[in-house]
Amino acid sequence: MFIFVVGLNHKSAPVEVREKLSFTEAQLSEALHKLQGMAGIEGCCILSTCNRTEIYGASTDMEKGMTAVKRFVLEWGQLQPQDFSKYFYVHTLYDAIRHLFRVASGLDSMVLGETQILGQVRTAYQRSCNEDCSNGIVNTWFQQAITVGKRVRTETGIDQHPVSISYTAVELAEQVLGGLKGRTAMVLGAGKMSVLTLKHLVAEGVDKIIIANRSVEKAEELAKSCGGEAISFADVNHRLEEADILISCTAATHYVIRKSMVEQVMDRRGGKPVFFFDIAVPRDIDPEVAQVPGTHLYDIDAMQHVIDRNLAERRKCAAEAEIIIEHEINQFMRWLNSLFVIPTIVGLKNKGNQIKEKELDRALCKLKHLSEKEKKLVGSLASSIVNQLLHDPITQLRHYAASPEGHLYSEILQNLFCLDVPGQRQKHVVVHYPAVEQRQNRA
C-alpha cells in the first residue's frame, strides 16, 4: 500500500487558481465518494481551507492512484493539463508523511505555527471517516499527524508567540494589566479586525466589552456574538471612562480619539490608567493622547516590534518542531514498512514452496520405485532446503523493516525473486529514501 498527497497552496498557486479547486461543505461529501470510487484509490481524505486544497490517499497501485487523482482535480477544477505541473505538488511515502505532519504542526501555514490548521486537519479526517472513505493506513496516518500537531505545540510553545496585530494588541493588554479578568474593554469599529479582536478578548476572559461603531446595527450584531454592549460613536466620550483598555480599528481617515477628549475622560477617572491600542492604518488615535497623564498608547509600529520578536521566537520553535517531526516520521515509517514486509515474506515463502512442489513432483515421477515412507523423506528434505535458503533473507528483511528504508529492501527482494505481491511491485515509480541517500552521498 502506497500513500500520497496531491495539492496546491498559497505558495504554489495564486488565489484565482486555488478558488477553482475549493469545496463547500456539501461538495466535500460528493468529492470524497467520487475519489473513493476511482480505480487505484483505497482510502482518501480532502483538506480544503482558504490557503490550500490537498488530497491525501492510499493506493495499492501508485500509477493508477496518481492517474485517478490527477484526472479528478483537473475535472473538478476545470483546469488544463499544464496547470497540474505548474501549480500542483505531489508527495509520496516519506515525503507525504512529512508534509502532513508539518501541515498539522502549522509549519506549512502562511502564519508560521498558527493553531487553526490542526482543527481543520481533524475535521477533514473526521469527515472522511463519516463518509466511509478512509482506510486503515489513512486512519493511522491522520491520527498520528493530529498527535504530532499537539505534541509540537505542547513541547515547543510555537503558538505562544502572537504574530497577528489583533492578537498582539490583546496579548500586550494582558501583559501590561497582569490579566484581563475583571477588566472592561472598549473596541472601536465593527470590521474583520474588530471581529478577531473580540474573539481574543473573550478568550482571555475580559469581564465587559463595549463596542462602538458609526452603524449601531453592526455593533449590535457583534455585541450579540460576544455578550457585549453596542454604542454609537457619539457615546464614546461618555463611556470611555468605564474602560481599562481601548482597542481601535476603524476605517476612518481622521483621528476618532483626540487629546482633549481623553483629558476629560482621565479627569473623570481620577487618574486611573487607560491603555490605548491603535491597530488602524491610518491611525485612529491622536499621538498626543500619550501626553495625557495616566494614558499608555501603543500604535501599530510599537506592536510590530513585538510581532517581529515573536516571529523570530516562532522560527526557533519551528526548528525544534522539525526534530520532533523527523522522529515521528521514522516511527510511522517503521509501521508502514512492516505492511510491505509481511506480504513480501508471504510471497517469498509461496515462491519457494511452488518451486519445491514443482521440482518434487518432477523428481518423484522418475523415482517411482520409492516407498511412501521414502517419498515423505524426500519431501521433508526439499522443505528443509527451502526453509534454510529463505531463513537468512527473511530474518534480514524483518530486521531492516524497522529502518526508514525498510520498504526499499522489501521492493528489492520482490524484484530479485520476481515475487507476485499484488499492488506492490511498481513500475516507473521513483521513491526517495533520505537515510539511504545521505549514506550514499557520504560514501
Swiss-Prot record:
<feature type="active site" description="Nucleophile">
    <location>
        <position position="50"/>
    </location>
</feature>
<keyword id="KW-0560">Oxidoreductase</keyword>
<dbReference type="Pfam" id="PF05201">
    <property type="entry name" value="GlutR_N"/>
</dbReference>
<comment type="function">
    <text>Catalyzes the NADPH-dependent reduction of glutamyl-tRNA(Glu) to glutamate 1-semialdehyde (GSA).</text>
</comment>
<dbReference type="InterPro" id="IPR006151">
    <property type="entry name" value="Shikm_DH/Glu-tRNA_Rdtase"/>
</dbReference>
<feature type="binding site">
    <location>
        <begin position="189"/>
        <end position="194"/>
    </location>
    <ligand>
        <name>NADP(+)</name>
    </ligand>
</feature>
<feature type="binding site">
    <location>
        <begin position="114"/>
        <end position="116"/>
    </location>
    <ligand>
        <name>substrate</name>
    </ligand>
</feature>
<dbReference type="InterPro" id="IPR036453">
    <property type="entry name" value="GluRdtase_dimer_dom_sf"/>
</dbReference>
<dbReference type="Pfam" id="PF01488">
    <property type="entry name" value="Shikimate_DH"/>
</dbReference>
<feature type="binding site">
    <location>
        <begin position="49"/>
        <end position="52"/>
    </location>
    <ligand>
        <name>substrate</name>
    </ligand>
</feature>
<feature type="site" description="Important for activity">
    <location>
        <position position="99"/>
    </location>
</feature>
<comment type="similarity">
    <text>Belongs to the glutamyl-tRNA reductase family.</text>
</comment>
<keyword id="KW-0627">Porphyrin biosynthesis</keyword>
<dbReference type="GO" id="GO:0019353">
    <property type="term" value="P:protoporphyrinogen IX biosynthetic process from glutamate"/>
</dbReference>
<dbReference type="InterPro" id="IPR018214">
    <property type="entry name" value="GluRdtase_CS"/>
</dbReference>
<comment type="subunit">
    <text>Homodimer.</text>
</comment>
<feature type="binding site">
    <location>
        <position position="120"/>
    </location>
    <ligand>
        <name>substrate</name>
    </ligand>
</feature>
<dbReference type="InterPro" id="IPR036291">
    <property type="entry name" value="NAD(P)-bd_dom_sf"/>
</dbReference>
<dbReference type="InterPro" id="IPR000343">
    <property type="entry name" value="4pyrrol_synth_GluRdtase"/>
</dbReference>
<keyword id="KW-0521">NADP</keyword>
<dbReference type="InterPro" id="IPR015896">
    <property type="entry name" value="4pyrrol_synth_GluRdtase_dimer"/>
</dbReference>
<dbReference type="GO" id="GO:0050661">
    <property type="term" value="F:NADP binding"/>
</dbReference>
<dbReference type="InterPro" id="IPR015895">
    <property type="entry name" value="4pyrrol_synth_GluRdtase_N"/>
</dbReference>
<dbReference type="InterPro" id="IPR036343">
    <property type="entry name" value="GluRdtase_N_sf"/>
</dbReference>
<protein>
    <recommendedName>
        <fullName>Glutamyl-tRNA reductase</fullName>
        <ecNumber>1.2.1.70</ecNumber>
    </recommendedName>
</protein>
<dbReference type="Pfam" id="PF00745">
    <property type="entry name" value="GlutR_dimer"/>
</dbReference>
<comment type="pathway">
    <text>Porphyrin-containing compound metabolism; protoporphyrin-IX biosynthesis; 5-aminolevulinate from L-glutamyl-tRNA(Glu): step 1/2.</text>
</comment>
<feature type="binding site">
    <location>
        <position position="109"/>
    </location>
    <ligand>
        <name>substrate</name>
    </ligand>
</feature>
<dbReference type="GO" id="GO:0008883">
    <property type="term" value="F:glutamyl-tRNA reductase activity"/>
</dbReference>
